């Protein structure tokens, strides 16, 4: 993180989220996890996707900072680009695909947390394997 990003004490963080997201090379990296929410940055390579999914008990807000793509939200497809934001309520089927020539970069807030605290996966395959084997479970209580 650059000089604008710092820790302020007991799990209190300050960062310029768009810069952190742009600098992230990983498919998915957890930046911060609290009791009720989690901040994650993602970089989707050209032709890649997050993957069709439903979070039964977790709301998700995604903000796109670079690239272009498509959002599939409950059976409807919409174009997305830098500056767009999507709010996905718990129980909604969704997927986000990179349809451009550059990485699709975003940050997302989950409430409650969806992934293991401090998890980082360089590729979608690594992230999927961690989920399949139970190594990407969110903290409890």
Range-by-range predicted roles:
Residues 61, 87, 102-117:
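A short hydrophobic beta-strand segment most commonly corresponding to one strand
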Residues 37, 46, 57, 76, ...:
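A generic "binding-loop/recognition-motif" signal
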Residues 22-26, 40-55:
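Conserved short histidine dyad/triad with adjacent acidic residue
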